[in-house]
Amino acid sequence: MKVLFIGGTGNISSAVSRLALSQGIDLYLLNRGKRRVDLPGARTILGDINQEKEIAKAIDGKYFDVIVNWIAFVPGEIERDIRLFRRHTSQYIFISSASIYQKPPSHPVVSESTPLANPFWQYSRDKIACEERLNRVYREEGFPMTIVRPSHTYDTVIPVAIGSWDDYTIIDRMKNGKKIIVHGDGTSLWTITHSEDFARGFVPLMGHQQAIGQSFHITSDESLNWNQIYQAVAAAADVEAKIVHIPSDFIAKFDEFQVGNLLGDKAVSTIFDNSKIKRFVPGYVATIPFNAGIKRTIEWFEKEPSRMRIKPENNHFMDQVIEAYEQVFESVPS
């Protein structure tokens, strides 16, 4: 099977690329060549997907069984992909987001039939618009699309809600005995999925004829509350977390991004029903528990000092919010 990834070297997609190559898939990566690619066996097509004429020339005369765009975020990019790829593939897979599901939810158990609506996050609304365009072109023109919605997925990032992502800040902060923020009272439920588990559900969808016209989320079945998540991160770093619980609304007052990140996503208890992906991919099961996966992630950061970057803005944000909250809290009569 001949497959083209637009992207393919990121936090989620690298694991998919590795699994695809291990299964003998003829994998091409379309990228700008700015990131070192450690994927033996993958072929590279150099180009910028935003330069449509350049890409049209690069794929002229080529046909791929599957094309996956890992880095499409707005409807205009979907329109471009429809123009570019309609005659070059039998399956186009769009990477959407599980953050598109209804917020606030009418039911905590989320399936692919859960309504799509997120008034808190423009990122999610753009992904919804992308899906709507793909569903329309599938219905009206038979464009062979499949939609996949990752949720909070990690490998080479630290998947906390506040304090880190592609940086080491939250770990450094814990190791130095500083306070960290957990939104709300830390008891809302959440699902975090390792990229290798995601890959085991994703790769079998490639070339799957019955997946055409369908949407899927692919997550772990492990539900943890946020206290457990931060405690697992601390345990993996061999420290204790000094948690300060702060209401999400209060946190969001300090940073517009947190409106979407918390109120439109991570502050909302969510339990994913993965029965659909298990029907289409018999035997799929996520096997990496978070306490084991996050230990691997921290070891990955600490293997190379250059990865252990500290973002001063993350420390400043946490210090600012904690100080303001503690002042308010202390002013309330006991």
Regions found by a protein language model. Give the residues of each.
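N-terminal Rossmann NAD(P)H-binding glycine-rich loop of SDR-like oxidoreductase domains
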Residues: 3-23
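Conserved glycine-rich Rossmann-like NAD(P)H-binding loop of the short-chain dehydrogenase/reductase
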Residues: 26-32
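NAD(P)-dependent short-chain dehydrogenase/reductase
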Residues: 140-189, 232-235
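Mid/C-terminal beta-alpha module of Rossmann-like enzyme folds, strongest
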Residues: 204-263, 274, 279, 296, ...
